[in-house]
């Protein structure tokens, strides 16, 4: 479209401020001119003259909007120029938005015209447009446009009926062509001839409406009283011509003053206002609104389809209640597509959401809150989908895409066909007997070629020329095509299969595969390794038979004898018989596997679940029956038959020794001549460490002795019964566990009977604290010096490899009386924690006594000083004492001091005296021995040292009679000048003790001690250091006697405080070797206070039941005791009363608020006043809960707190607890659907045990809408009394898994269930 040459800036930009002012001025002038001279022709709505002769439509060039139509004549030369220069006559022509909207105009939102004119012009215009080109007209009928209102002003005097003439014929009559300027041909509408037209306005003016020009209620200048008195002013609208004109543009009112610009200055950025704002829509109300209503369904897409859909629904459920959610799946594959629809529903107010949320509001909040957000790592899009059309469109798009993908095959995965053979060319293939390849690679045409290429870019994987001609000296392995068919895809699989071997390349031709290696020593090694490992192994369904050539084709002779196969293209030779047989076996195996699979499929198809379940149950019952017969019938019968007690008569009949029938057999030691011991273990040569750590009985250990290879080979160290030859010396080392059982080696080396030695070993470590044993060892080590290399622990690994050349001398056995004395002496040490003087345990015969007292290998001390630290030892005693000492002697010429002396009986002392009578020694030897004996005597008393360091029961220790004093007896005969009181001529007992003597502080007063018998205080102070008691010695002694008097039944102070049967020896000698064993209740009842109480109560009830409750005195005493306990329980302390008064005011306030709900009141009171309770070990079962103060009846004690779970979850947890080994589960049922689980999350109330006569009860109360479990007191509960209540399990009489009840009350039912 071309524009006129005279177009100005104002024509192209009519909305400019200056152009607006000019156009307003022109309109005022035209209005004044029109009023001065009234028009002779009718005016259109734009103020133009409308001639009735002929009309046409054309676009004006004066800057009017494209929607405005100007009525001009068909003579373009005259009217066009006049219209182009004529200014507009009305205000409606000023701006595009001010024109009267007709059919085809812009939106009604962009116009400020009156709705009256719009309605009056739109109806006839549409009527004329509907009959366009359908009615006839003559030459007098004008043509008009669909948007022109000028046809409305036609004279009403033209009344002509329409003729039935075609539009084409009418055009010929009028001499008009249907094609006019521009697009006006489409809007030409011939009016019917003589049609009576309705005028747009009624010629007679009428009142259209009434306008309020003044409203006193809106006048801010008037007061309230004046507003009531004043009356509004109304004006009729429609009587004047000005009322027909559209209202003026309010934006032009301030054009001259403010230079109006169409912007909003109240915002930070100038915002262009194109149209007036629309009214706010009314909120949706289902009662009054019409239509479907706002959307309640949304579409969510873009999330990961692999995540759990519950995560998506959980996120969107935060905006409102979800009525329905659908995660869309592919209808054919069943895979999720990554988009879903969620429909909301109206939510009711809840505790978490007190305000109800309508469904449409929840959907709107979800769209606003989640659109563009991320779910995990993916950004999602959320939009409304009220009818599911969007989701349906997405589903159709996915299905269409999948169909297109399935219909058009992918070129990347398309298997290309190989080159077709030339005419007359025959391509050799595998022989008929060769194994067939996979079905995907078999030829479809029968006689077609046998291989294809997987990738078109590698068409020459299978080489046409023989490869063997190109291989010179490189080592290679040949795999013939008879074993593995030649196919291009097999080369890649073979490379992956043999990638662990260093080959250079794998090439293939029609004869087979060539695995080529590097021409070096490394390459030949790799080829050999590959041949040895992969030859004749399975390769898919084939057997990969290899032929190794280490030096290629021109090198040395290869290992293959079938080289001709490399030069032949298609060898007709059949495989060797062994390979053919192997192939047949593989084929049969594959056929059998196929038959088995087919049978499995048939079984699965015809499977009957009932029969299969019955078969499984039958099989399990058979296994259970066999297991029951084996464990319940067979094993007990075999054990009863093999019990040695049942065969005692038969052993006596056959004269078989009954020594092995006891529980702990004796260990018989061999002598020095090399006779082996008859006692041994089945695995006596096993690792000594394993034998040490295993749970083996002492009776199974074998004590070995070495032959004497020289007495001086190993002078200092232990005589280990398990020691072997020690070729080398070892580093000074001593393990710590030796200190825990320091006397075990002494007893075994002395040849004591194993039965009694085991008892002594197990008693000593149990009765002595570990700290005391360790401290004694340390003190002895400090006195004797540092450790020597020859000392070693007998139970370490390195000790078995060291050389031990020392010879053990003969062992002697103690008789029963002597061992009984030793045990009695040890028992006294246990009770008083004091060490008594040495009593030698050996009982030598007359010949051995002479040998034992002969000093051999001991140098005489110089000058015969009596205070020398040298002591003469017999040879045998020296050797045995050397093995018994906890520390060795640092020097060979200086014998060590004994840390712990051997204990002897009176009989042994007497026999030694007799032996010493027969031996006459020099005076200096006897003086030295006597001095050593005195020093040893001084070293033994530990009681006073214990009292100085603060031991709980320090007791001074007497000196009984030692070897040193015994050696003084012969001195009287050789030296008559000695004191006859000290050295009498006849042997008399130095200290005569009664048979019932018990070592105690009270009995020490009755023992006559000599002046030299007292301990050396300076030496003890130098050895142990000084310490102080926390009180006076007499006060300590008085407390000790008082404690003994209160804890004894008869009030005696002689008996020590102890529990009978508390110290139980371990059968193996050490608690660590016992492993884990359950302590019986019978043993717990000896030392646990609660068990003792329960045991006494049970015995008392049994006694009363046996006597028929005839003891009225005891019953009265029991009733009095219960009454006293009740009074004590009812009485509260003053502090408790003060605390009770403190809450009186608050309790009254709560009572007013809660009314009669006493349980809630007491529960709130329990929160602030919890009863002090504690948990401790219980006599009933494991842990129990105890009251720390007196509790009155009906008092609320504690709440049962735990995790609240559903019934189904509780059943699963109970099974899991039993399976995991927890055993005790703390599940408390509130109702049929709720269970409190306090097993892993809970309070101490879960430790309350069951009792058939409980003192508490459990009640379920409702607090703030939730159910709580609270424990009440059934009766008055005394302090330190255990809290119990009845579990109320359902009775399962006849069940095999009933739970025994351990409450021990008089009304005990025996079982919980």
UniProtKB/Swiss-Prot annotation:
PROSITE patterns named in the record? POST_SET, SAM_MT43_1, SET
**Where in the sequence does UniProt note compositional bias of the Low complexity kind?**
7-18, 105-121
The record's listing under InterPro entries reads: COMPASS_Set1_N-SET, Nucleotide-bd_a/b_plait_sf, Post-SET_dom, RBD_domain_sf, Set1-like, Set1_fungi, SET_assoc, SET_dom
Q: Which SUPFAM superfamilies match?
A: RNA-binding domain, RBD, SET domain
Q: Which residues form a coiled coil?
A: none
Location, primary (coarse class): nucleus
Q: In what ranges is there compositional bias, type Basic residues?
A: 702-716, 895-907
Q: Name one GO cellular component term.
A: chromosome
Q: Which UniProt keywords apply?
A: Chromatin regulator, Chromosome, Methyltransferase, Nucleus, S-adenosyl-L-methionine, Transferase
Query: Where is the short sequence motif RxxxRR motif located?
Result: 1137-1142
Localization, per the record, is: Nucleus; Chromosome
Q: Any idea which positions bind S-adenosyl-L-methionine? A: 1287
Top EC class for this record: transferase
Per the database record, which ranges form the Post-SET domain?
1297-1313
Comp. bias (Basic and acidic residues): 19-31, 194-204, 559-607, 758-784, 868-884, 960-978
Biased segments, Polar residues type: 70-80, 130-158, 174-186, 843-855
Chain spans, region Disordered = 1-205, 400-458, 555-607, 667-792, 842-908, 932-982
**What processes does the entry annotate via GO biological process terms?**
methylation
EC number from the UniProt entry: 2.1.1.354
Q: Which family does it belong to?
A: Belongs to the class V-like SAM-binding methyltransferase superfamily.
Q: What is recorded about the protein's domains?
A: The RxxxRR motif forms an adapter helix that bridges the nucleosome and ubiquitin.
| Oligomer status and interactors | Component of the Set1C/COMPASS complex.
Q: PANTHER family this protein is in? A: HISTONE-LYSINE N-METHYLTRANSFERASE SETD1 (PTHR45814:SF2)
Protein name as catalogued: Histone-lysine N-methyltransferase, H3 lysine-4 specific
Q: What is the lineage of its organism?
A: Eukaryota, Fungi, Dikarya, Ascomycota, Pezizomycotina
Q: Which gene encodes it?
A: set-1
């Amino acid at each position: 479209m071309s524009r006129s040459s005279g177009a100005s800036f104002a024509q192209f930009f009519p909305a400019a401020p200056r152009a607006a002012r000019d156009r307003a001025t022109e309109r005022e002038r035209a209005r004044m001119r029109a009023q001065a001279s009234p028009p002779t022709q009718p005016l259109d709505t734009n103020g133009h003259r409308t001639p009735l002769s002929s009309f046409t439509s054309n676009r004006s060039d004066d800057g009017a909007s494209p929607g405005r139509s100007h009525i001009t004549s068909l003579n373009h030369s005259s009217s066009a120029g006049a219209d182009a220069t004529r200014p507009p006559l009305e205000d409606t022509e000023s701006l595009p938005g001010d024109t009267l909207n007709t059919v085809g105009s812009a939106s009604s939102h962009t116009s400020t015209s009156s709705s009256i004119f719009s309605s009056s012009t739109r109806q006839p215009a549409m009527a004329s447009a509907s009959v366009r080109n359908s009615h006839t007209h003559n030459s007098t009928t004008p043509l008009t446009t669909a948007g022109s209102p000028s046809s409305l002003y036609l004279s009403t005097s033209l009344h002509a009926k329409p003729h039935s003439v075609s539009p084409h014929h009418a055009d010929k009559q009028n001499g008009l062509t249907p094609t006019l300027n521009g697009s006006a041909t489409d809007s030409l509408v011939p009016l019917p001839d003589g049609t009576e037209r309705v005028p747009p306005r009624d010629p007679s003016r009428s009142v259209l409406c009434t306008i309020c020009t003044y409203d006193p209620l809106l006048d801010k200048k008037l007061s309230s009283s004046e507003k009531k008195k004043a009356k509004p002013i109304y004006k009729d609208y429609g009587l004047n011509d000005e009322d027909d004109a559209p209202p003026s543009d309010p934006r032009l009112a301030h054009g001259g003053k403010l230079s109006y610009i169409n912007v909003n200055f109240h915002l930070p950025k100038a915002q262009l206002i194109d149209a007036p704002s629309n009214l706010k829509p009314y909120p949706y109300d289902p009662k009054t609104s019409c239509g479907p209503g706002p959307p309640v369904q949304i579409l969510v897409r873009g999330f990961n389809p692999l995540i759990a859909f519950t995560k998506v629904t959980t996120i969107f459920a935060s905006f409102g209640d979800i009525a329905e959610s659908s995660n869309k799946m592919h209808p054919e594959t069943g895979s999720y597509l990554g988009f879903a629809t969620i429909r909301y529903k109206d939510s009711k107010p809840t505790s978490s959401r007190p305000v109800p949320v309508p469904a449409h509001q929840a959907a709107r909040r979800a769209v606003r809150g989640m659109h563009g957000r991320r779910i995990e790592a993916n950004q999602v899009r959320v939009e409304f989908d009220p009818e599911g059309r969007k989701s349906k469109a997405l589903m159709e798009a996915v299905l269409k895409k999948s169909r297109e993908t399935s219909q058009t095959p992918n070129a990347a995965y398309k298997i290309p066909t190989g080159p077709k053979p030339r005419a007359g060319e025959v391509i050799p293939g595998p022989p008929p007997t060769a194994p067939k390849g996979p079905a995907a690679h078999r030829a479809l045409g029968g006689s077609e070629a046998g291989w294809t290429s997987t990738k078109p870019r590698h068409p020459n994987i299978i080489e046409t020329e023989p490869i063997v001609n190109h291989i010179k000296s490189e080592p290679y392995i040949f795999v013939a095509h008879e074993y593995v068919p030649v196919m291009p895809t097999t080369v890649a699989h073979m490379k992956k299969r043999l990638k662990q071997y260093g080959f250079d390349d794998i090439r293939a031709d029609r004869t087979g595969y060539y695995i080529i290696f590097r021409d070096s020593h490394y390459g030949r090694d790799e080829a050999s390794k590959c041949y040895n490992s992969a030859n004749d192994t399975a390769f898919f369904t084939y057997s990969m038979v290899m032929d190794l050539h280490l030096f290629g084709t021109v090198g040395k002779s290869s290992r293959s004898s079938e080289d001709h196969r490399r030069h032949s293209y298609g060898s007709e030779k059949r495989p060797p018989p062994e390979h053919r047989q192997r192939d047949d076996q593989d084929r049969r195996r594959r056929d059998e596997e196929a038959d088995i699979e087919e049978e499995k499929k048939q079984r699965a198809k015809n499977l009957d679940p009932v029969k299969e379940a019955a078969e499984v149950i039958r099989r399990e019952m058979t296994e259970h029956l066999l297991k029951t017969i084996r464990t319940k019938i067979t094993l007990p019968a075999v054990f009863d038959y093999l019990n040695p007690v049942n065969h005692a008569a038969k052993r006596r009949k056959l004269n078989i020794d009954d020594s092995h029938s006891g529980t702990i057999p004796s260990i018989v030691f061999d002598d020095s001549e090399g006779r082996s011991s008859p006692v041994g273990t089945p695995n006596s040569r096993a690792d000594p460490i394993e034998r040490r750590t295993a749970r083996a009985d002492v009776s199974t250990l074998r004590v070995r002795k070495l032959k004497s290879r020289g007495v001086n080979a190993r002078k200092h160290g232990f005589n280990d019964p398990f020691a072997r030859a020690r070729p080398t010396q070892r580093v000074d080392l001593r393990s710590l566990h030796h200190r825990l059982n320091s006397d075990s080696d002494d007893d075994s080396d002395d040849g004591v009977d194993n039965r009694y030695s085991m008892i002594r070993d197990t008693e000593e470590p149990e009765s002595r604290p570990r700290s005391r044993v360790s401290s004694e060892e340390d003190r002895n080590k400090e006195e004797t010096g540092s450790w020597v290399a020859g000392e070693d622990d007998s139970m370490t690994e390195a000790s078995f490899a060291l050389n031990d050349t020392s010879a053990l001398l003969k062992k002697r056995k103690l008789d029963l009386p002597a061992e009984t004395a030793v045990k009695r002496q040890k028992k006294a040490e246990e009770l008083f924690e004091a060490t008594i003087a040495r009593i030698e345990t050996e009982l030598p015969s007359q010949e051995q006594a002479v040998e034992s007292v002969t000093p051999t290998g001991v140098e005489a001390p110089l000058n015969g000083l009596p205070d020398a630290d040298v002591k003469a030892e017999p040879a045998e005693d020296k050797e045995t004492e050397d093995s018994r000492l906890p520390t060795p002697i640092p020097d060979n010429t200086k014998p060590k001091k004994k840390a712990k002396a051997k204990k002897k009986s009176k009989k042994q002392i007497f026999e030694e005296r007799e032996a010493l009578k027969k031996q006459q020694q020099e005076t200096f030897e006897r003086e030295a021995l006597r001095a050593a004996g005195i020093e040893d005597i001084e070293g033994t008393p530990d009681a006073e040292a214990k009292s100085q360091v603060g031991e709980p029961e320090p007791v001074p220790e007497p000196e009984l009679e030692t070897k040193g004093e015994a050696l003084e007896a012969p001195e009287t005969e050789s030296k008559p000048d000695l004191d006859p009181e000290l050295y009498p001529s006849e042997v008399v007992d130095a200290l005569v003790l009664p048979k019932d003597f018990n070592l105690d502080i009270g009995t020490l007063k009755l023992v006559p001690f000599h002046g030299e018998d007292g301990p050396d205080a300076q030496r003890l102070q130098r050895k142990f250091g000084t310490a102080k008691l926390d009180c006076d010695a007499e006060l300590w002694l008085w407390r000790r006697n008082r404690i003994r008097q209160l804890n004894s039944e008869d009030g005696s102070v002689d008996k020590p405080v102890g529990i009978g049967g508390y110290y139980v020896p371990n059968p193996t000698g050490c608690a660590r070797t016992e492993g884990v064993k359950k302590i019986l209740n019978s043993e717990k009842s000896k030392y646990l206070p609660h068990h003792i109480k329960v045991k006494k109560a049970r015995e008392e009830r049994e006694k009363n039941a046996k006597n028929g409750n005839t003891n009225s005195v005891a019953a009265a005493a029991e009733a009095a005791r219960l009454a006293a306990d009740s009074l004590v329980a009812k009485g509260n302390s003053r502090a408790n009363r003060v605390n009770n008064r403190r809450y009186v005011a608050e309790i009254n306030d709560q009572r007013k608020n809660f009314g009669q709900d006493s349980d809630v009141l007491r529960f709130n009171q329990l929160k602030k006043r919890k009863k002090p309770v504690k948990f401790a070990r219980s006599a009933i079962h494991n842990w129990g809960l105890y009251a720390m103060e007196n509790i009155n009846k009906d008092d609320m004690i504690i709440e049962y707190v735990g995790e609240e779970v559903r019934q189904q979850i509780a059943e699963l947890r109970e099974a899991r607890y039993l399976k995991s080994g927890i055993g005790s589960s703390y599940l408390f049922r509130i109702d049929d659907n709720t269970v409190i689980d306090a097993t892993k999350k809970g309070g101490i109330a879960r430790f309350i045990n069951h009792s058939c006569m409980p003192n508490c009860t459990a009640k379920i109360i409702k607090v703030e809408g939730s159910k709580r479990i609270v424990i009440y007191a059934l009766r008055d509960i005394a302090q330190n009394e255990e809290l119990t209540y009845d579990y109320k399990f359902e009775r399962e009489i006849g069940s095999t898994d009933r739970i025994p009840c351990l409450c021990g009350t008089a009304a005990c039912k025996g079982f919980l269930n």
